[in-house]
Amino acid sequence: MSNLKLIFISDLHLSPSETLKTNIFLRFLKSNIGRSIHLFILGDLFDYWIGDDDRANPLFSMVVPALREFTNTGARLSVMHGNRDFLIGKSFSGLTRAQLLPDPFIIDIYGNRTLLSHGDQWCTDDIEYQAIRSMVRSDEWMNNFLRLTITERHQQAKNYRQKSETSKENKTTEIMDVSLSTVDQAFVTHDCHRIIHGHTHR
């Protein structure tokens, strides 16, 4: 790992409606082709992802080939699920040659034991969010969702996003942030010296 340049990103929330952001990311990948890089994407690369079979999604035809070109030239790619794109699956992983990381995940960074996470599971003060997170991450919920048609999944995803935005209006920033005591406990539980996470956009 010492010969690799490690890059950590999260929460790009790429969306078909925000082409500028997507193009910046694609230029970043292009500029690093052939370099000795390990790119870690710690969740929410996409603003939403309803399944690997949604091939009509413009981001699929733009981002997946770019990631494949990136990894084909020697770069490494590790992807962690976020709260918006936890349905990224084995097909996406195979097409992009990405390693799907469990959350949390321990790595050694130049001798420092480091915990990687998207981070949303540490927002424990937001009880409503944690209940929803537990539901949608269950195998039963995901299997049922993936049985729906593409159109039905898009509509449900839109409804969930609208409800989420409405819910945020009635919550303080502190409630939606990670709980410091929960993060402190993660340091102890995983015996690590550093934590790198996303989700909170701070």
Task: Outline where the language-model segments fall.
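Acidic, His- and aromatic-enriched active-site or binding-groove loops in soluble protein domains
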Residues: 108-109, 114, 141
